[in-house]
Amino acid sequence: MKMEEMSLSGLDNSKLEAIAQEIYADLVEDSCLGFCFEVHRAVKCGYFFLDDTDPDSMKDFEIVDQPGLDIFGQVFNQWKSKECVCPNCSRSIAASRFAPHLEKCLGMGRNSSRIANRRIANSNNMNKSESDQEDNDDINDNDWSYGSEKKAKKRKSDKNPNSPRRSKSLKHKNGELSNSDPFKYSNSTGISYETLGPEELRSLLTTQCGVISEHTKKMCTRSLRCPQHTDEQRRTVRIYFLGPSAVLPEVESSLDNDGFDMTDSQALISRLQWDGSSDLSPSDSGSSKTSENQGWGLGTNSSESRKTKKKKSHLSLVGTASGLGSNKKKKPKPPAPPTPSIYDDIN
């Protein structure tokens, strides 16, 4: 006897019917659930009533095939600029300007990469300063951290002292030092006055211009005869840093036309006149010329040319001497009107 016959032989007819009914119910339930899920999906996806579609709604989605119109029936404008949405700032930008805008917005271009790196470095410095502030409460004291927040970024030439470009002769431009200074400034575009001490400021203002630029906020390192700035600006800088008792240092001049004395001019004129009196008079020159022509048989052109040259040189020397003497009598020019200064903003 088989095992199936042994298991079913001990069951009653009622139990067999119950088992058959349960199996039938499971099959019907599975088939109904599958059908319901298919109908639900077709309705949600929109393809359940494809065969019984309304003709009016079909006209709304009908493909248009006419010249000058696109498939939706709209007028096609080929000159209309296409717009793209920036993924970073969500702005609508023309397609022709999308690539450069994306470089600047994401910090991937030449200039924008430097700006982005600078922003990242500043944010890292701020985070580091905040963490240090939690450790030490006195880290932001003005006496100790005055210049720490405004440290300039080191140049590549400063990072590499063995660079061949550093051995080249430096041109004396505005903000550059041509000679070795007791205080060595690494910034070639000017000196930041905020990082200098009182002694450094005093020594700098006695030998250099020191006027603060309106754009870079740095001091000019040219000499005291800087043509870009006036004496009034230099005097204002010294009063601002050294107090009202500060005086603009005098500049030694290698050639001073105003120092010519009238006595020297008179002596020069008299000497030139004495030298001129040693020449022959016109009458004597005429007699000498005739005697020379008769005695030696020479022409008079050479003697006349020499005398005209002497007279011209004599007149030119007298004119220069009188011009030098008249420099003393010239009136000084009125001072230039005061220019608007930037120290009101600093104060």
Swiss-Prot record:
Coiled coil: none
GO biological process: chromatin organization; positive regulation of DNA-templated transcription; regulation of DNA repair; regulation of RNA splicing; regulation of transcription by RNA polymerase II
Organism name: Mus musculus (Mouse)
Function statement: Component of the transcription regulatory histone acetylation (HAT) complex SAGA, a multiprotein complex that activates transcription by remodeling chromatin and mediating histone acetylation and deubiquitination. Within the SAGA complex, participates in a subcomplex that specifically deubiquitinates both histones H2A and H2B. The SAGA complex is recruited to specific gene promoters by activators such as MYC, where it is required for transcription. Required for nuclear receptor-mediated transactivation. Within the complex, it is required to recruit USP22 and ENY2 into the SAGA complex.
Biased composition (Acidic residues): 132-141
Pfam families, per the entry: SCA7, Sgf11
GO cellular component: DUBm complex; SAGA complex; transcription factor TFTC complex
Recorded domain comment: The long N-terminal helix forms part of the 'assembly lobe' of the SAGA deubiquitination module.
InterPro entries, alphabetized: SAGA_su_Sgf11 (IPR013246), SCA7_dom (IPR013243), SGF11 (IPR051078)
SGF11-type zinc finger locations on the chain: 84-105
Subunit and partners: Component of some SAGA transcription coactivator-HAT complexes, at least composed of ATXN7, ATXN7L3, ENY2, GCN5L2, SUPT3H, TAF10, TRRAP and USP22. Within the SAGA complex, ENY2, ATXN7, ATXN7L3, and USP22 form an additional subcomplex of SAGA called the DUB module (deubiquitination module). Interacts directly with ENY2 and USP22.
Organism placement in taxonomy: Eukaryota, Metazoa, Chordata, Craniata, Vertebrata
Highest taxon of source: Eukaryota
Name listed for the protein in its UniProt record: Ataxin-7-like protein 3
Family per similarity comment: Belongs to the SGF11 family.
Localization, UniProt: Nucleus
Keyword Transcription: yes
Keywords: Activator, Chromatin regulator, Metal-binding, Nucleus, Phosphoprotein, Transcription, Transcription regulation, Zinc, Zinc-finger
Region spans: Disordered: 116-184, 275-347
SCA7 domain: residues covered: 196-263
Residue numbers bearing the Phosphoserine modification: 129, 131, 278, 281, 326
Main location: nucleus
Biased composition (Low complexity): 116-125, 275-288
Transmembrane segments: none
GO molecular function: transcription coactivator activity; zinc ion binding
